[in-house]
């Protein structure tokens, strides 16, 4: 199944619901960053949560960044996404191994630790807005739900899951987000709570072959709703050799001269996708000459 999300509205416009399958992009992140299982689970949940949050963006030029700043051994997670379904991210320390939590689950909460969650929206008309809240569990889904309720004043339920196989590869990943407006009837609130309990593990649902539409059909059982959009999801990266060369041009004259004189050239690694760009001393010298010509 290809990765995608769906966006729906229900209960007379009082309920907004989103569901996504993110197995392929989470596996791509695992492959690029060589993450160990608990880091894979944490990064996959963060990528999925970022994709769901970005589904609220309305302009092709808008983007959203999620930063999980915890004091656990993962040392933080950073993800971003745009309105077109492009999602990317990385974990600071990909090689973390912890004892499993209860029932043998990967201990994402301990790996993330305590700290803060930051969401930055770059909007077409309103500019840049950053909200934040404390991490309540480090499990990502609970932290996002708390953030949305506390910082954005939108009561929300969030479910995120990643199932990792014995070989470390991603078997299934996905999630949902349900947001309630103030006028949501109490009966619909109760029904949603019951439905979410019936859905259970979202990663198990994806592993069993449920599509985003089918996940929403369970979450919104008994509530009139309409699917408004389907959005493909992928893990591309905007880095390029040209952008890396531009980063070298930001070095000062002394640093550039040192790279040329030592004959080492330069090497840059993209944090988001782990791509490595290498430049010879001659290429660095050309950058240096170009800077002098502009002076």
From Swiss-Prot:
Family stated for the protein in its record: Belongs to the HSP33 family.
Protein's UniProt name: 33 kDa chaperonin
Keywords from the UniProt entry: Chaperone, Cytoplasm, Disulfide bond, Redox-active center, Zinc
One GO CC term, this protein: cytoplasm
Changes after translation: Under oxidizing conditions two disulfide bonds are formed involving the reactive cysteines. Under reducing conditions zinc is bound to the reactive cysteines and the protein is inactive.
An annotated Gene Ontology molecular function: protein folding chaperone
Task performed by this protein: Redox regulated molecular chaperone. Protects both thermally unfolding and oxidatively damaged proteins from irreversible aggregation. Plays an important role in the bacterial defense system toward oxidative stress.
Species of origin: Symbiobacterium thermophilum (strain DSM 24528 / JCM 14929 / IAM 14863 / T)
